[in-house]
Structures are given as C-alpha cells and as structure tokens.
C-alpha cells in the first residue's frame, strides 16, 4: 500500500534509479562489499506496452545515463502465455541475462542493446530514416522466431499518437545500420515513429488470437548460442497424458503462433 507508481517516463525513471540505489546500498551493507553490484534490467514489452512506450523508454534511457545500469533488451521475442513468460521463455530470458552479465562483468566488455540513435527526414517527403546502434552486424528482419508483424513492427503517426493519425507505410527496408520507412503520404509537421507498440499485430492475423501487440521483427546478428534447447510443452507420454501438467480446460501450452 502507498507504494508510488506511475506511467510517466520521467517519474518512472526516477523511481527506477531510486530502487537501484536502495538495492545496491542494502547489498553493500549486508555483505560488506565495497563495490556496487551492477543493475541489469529488461525492457517492458509485448502485451504490457502502453501508448507512447514510456516505461520501456525510461528503462533504456536509465541504462544509457547510468554506468551501473545495463539494459539487456526486450523480452517480446520470448514465448509467453497471456503476457507472462512460459518455461521456455523464462529459460531464454535467464540465458539473456547471463550473457549480458558475463560479457560486461567477467569479460569486461561494454554491452548496449540494439537501439535507435537518431531519426531524420529523407530528401523524399514520404521517407524517414532511423539510425541504429547495432551490437553485431548485420541488422536483420527476423520472421523465424516471431511471425511477420505488420510493417515489421513499425508505425508512423502525424501530430499525435491517435489511430486516425496513423500513416500508411508502403515500404520498410534495411540500409546498413539504418531502417528506412516510406509512407504513402508526405510527412508534414510533427512525426512520431513507434516500434513494437500497442497496435502491432501479426500481418496475416490482424484480429486473430495472439495478435502479438508490442512485438517487432528487427534484430542484430549476435552469434551467442543457447545452452539449453526449447522444450515442447505439449509433448505427450505413451499413455496419451501430457508430460507438462496443465489445467483441465487447457489443450495446449505452446503459443498460438
């Protein structure tokens, strides 16, 4: 009760830094260690996105502004059930955190996730160019791990983030470390670019189950290989019963896609 919460980006970032400082202080006092432990966070995403993506932006900005915070990246590529990661998703998430910790704290190499660094208008009035920090080239649209999201997860709006101001995107293409968006109409006035937002959906399933809001297909080419393999949560035994338990009304645990 009476715990502060917010969806405002600045306020959330301040609260995130506060809890980071409090946790580090507690650990240093409890274990008498001189150094602050690193604080690794993910980016809120998938079904938990809200409008202007203020929370995920606050998490990324905090990591970029504080030397002792590392953003490991989003978790939307990982399998979930109703927004909560399933066994495979949590295992994958754990490996992502382990990779980031090992690279940054054991190998001593800095880690920054794939992220935009600049957005600029092109000569053509219908085009926008988004420049990225790409940890491992090349930049890729991946439709293997996630079904193809409409426009690979990108959305463009004029003036404000309202459905009626959403622009029709004719083409999305990768150009080196950049993504170039070509819209149907000239982009005049304030332009808002959204990636993996609340209105994203599987391209061939705009109104179907598991539309995958908060998802996109853009990734880098990190060569890291997982230690563990995906487990079929719907595998059955010889007697026809499921290996992994479930409620009586559930016929499958795998994501619908």
Where are these regions (language model features)?
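Cell-envelope and extracellular/periplasmic
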Residues: 1-257
